[in-house]
Design a protein with these regions (language model features):
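Short, charged surface segments at domain edges that flank catalytic/cofactor-binding sites
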Residues: 4-65, 93-104
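Cysteine-rich micro-motifs
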Residues: 105-113
Length: 126
């Protein structure tokens, strides 16, 4: 049995694979979503003044899952209902709609809880 080799479509004058192209689009959209007001508002709602010994840290944020407090760099704003995949033009409308959602689909979550949730979401939605 001979397997036919799948020929992948190339973009950008043959320098980018199809998956690389959609990865670039996904990354650009996620970057822009950081300034989406519901995302910044969600983070603000979980913030309090830091009272520990680190003089450089001014605030800390509460994880909605484990309920512990974390510095800014250890917290993420998570989509409760996963955003989904972006692998083709057909995925684009749903991906954008889910990514740029309102605050009722957002929560602050620490890095370790986020990792666990993301792995569960990938298993569930594959």
């Amino acid at each position: 049995l001979k397997m036919k080799k799948k020929i992948e479509k190339l973009r950008n004058h043959g320098t980018m694979t199809e998956s690389g192209f959609w990865g670039m689009i996904r990354s650009a959209l996620r970057q822009k979503s950081r300034w989406w007001k519901p995302i910044t508002e969600c983070k603000q709602k979980s913030k309090r003044a830091y009272t520990g010994n680190n003089k450089r840290q001014k605030f800390e944020y509460k994880c909605n899952v484990c309920k512990n407090w974390f510095p800014d760099k250890e917290i993420a704003v998570d989509h409760i209902k996963p955003v989904g995949t972006l692998k083709s033009a057909q995925d684009l409308p749903k991906f954008v709609e889910n990514l740029f959602c309102e605050i009722d689909n957002l929560q602050t979550i620490c890095a370790s809880c986020h990792l666990i949730k993301t792995k569960k979401d990938k298993i569930t939605h594959e």
